[in-house]
Amino acid sequence: MFLVNSFLKGGGGGGGGGGLGGGLGNVLGGLISGAGGGGGGGGGGGGGGAGGGGTAMRILGGVISAISEAAAQYNPEPPPPRTHYSNIEANESEEVRQFRRLFAQLAGDDMEVSATELMNILNKVVTRHPDLKTDGFGLDTCRSMVAVMDSDTTGKLGFEEFKYLWNNIKKWQAIYKQFDVDRSGTICSRELPGAFEAAGFHLNEHLYNMIIRRYSDEAGNMDFDNFISCLVRLDAMFRAFKSLDKDGTGQIQVNIQEWLQLTMYS
């Protein structure tokens, strides 16, 4: 069993909201309109297999600890239960009804959003915002975003899953613009902690450094698609930790199958 300990403060807050209405053209721009990678390296060297294994375990332990430290007190709103997009509640606001109509146009005949459809949606939106520096959302990034939001493991996003993701993207896009103080279109390493804290993630220095190595360029600058991809993954990991920490002890135990499910489908 893996024992994951938590001993530092976490973040608060979950999905954002607002700005859902309008026709397809207006909504695509309005939903995302702002309010106003390199990978890590591995250790090497001689000393035998036992030493290498020890190094790997220390690295893995550090990753687990850094994540659990930040997740312990994170209190996001979980995505609502999955329902068909046409199941309109009597007290539903006109804004949400408009979003249902938008979803019906975006999702296609199966009324679910695939990774390819999500990629097309996001890339259409970011082209309307030249102040957001991005290389565009790639298919692999969107597959990962779908996977970590896919609560029922269908491989696609239903209405509530998509709405939760979309609300978060809108909130995080506003934060991105707010903390891009030099208007470079990117967030640099010194701007990153403030942006992440505004999004509800209070991380330690070790985890910030890991994120910069994974999601930023060689100069330490993070563009918009990497910023969103990183926050989607953090949000999902924190929600997973909270759901497994049923007693609120700041510790979870998972077997190897649960661990693989958490880490491989993401």
From Swiss-Prot:
Cellular component annotations (GO), alphabetically ordered: calpain complex; cytosol; plasma membrane
Protein keywords: Acetylation, Calcium, Cell membrane, Cytoplasm, Membrane, Metal-binding, Phosphoprotein, Repeat
Record PTM N-acetylmethionine, positions in chain: M1
Sequence positions that bind Ca(2+) 2: D150, D152, T154, K156, E161
Residue numbers binding Ca(2+) 4: D135, D223
Location of this chain's protein in the cell: Cytoplasm; Cell membrane
Paired cysteines (S-S): none
Binding site for Ca(2+) 3: D180, D182, S184, T186, E191
Residues that hold Ca(2+) 1 according to the record: A107, D110, E112, E117
Residue numbers carrying Phosphoserine: S6
All copies of domain EF-hand, residue ranges: 94-128, 137-170, 167-202, 203-231, 232-266
Modified residues (N6-acetyllysine): K177
Top-level taxon: Eukaryota
Molecular function as annotated in GO: calcium ion binding; calcium-dependent cysteine-type endopeptidase activity
Modifications after synthesis and translation: The N-terminus is blocked.
UniProt remark on domains: The contact of the 5th EF-hand domain from each monomer allows the formation of the homodimer and also appears to mediate the contact between the large catalytic subunit and small regulatory subunit for the formation of the heterodimer.
UniProt cross-references to PANTHER family, sorted A to Z: CALPAIN SMALL SUBUNIT 1-RELATED (PTHR46735:SF3), CALPAIN, SMALL SUBUNIT 1 A-RELATED (PTHR46735)
Assembly notes: Homodimer or heterodimer of a large (catalytic) and a small (regulatory) subunit. In presence of calcium, the heterodimer dissociates.
Summary of the function given for this chain in its UniProt record: Regulatory subunit of the calcium-regulated non-lysosomal thiol-protease which catalyzes limited proteolysis of substrates involved in cytoskeletal remodeling and signal transduction. Essential for embryonic development.
Name of the protein this chain belongs to: Calpain small subunit 1
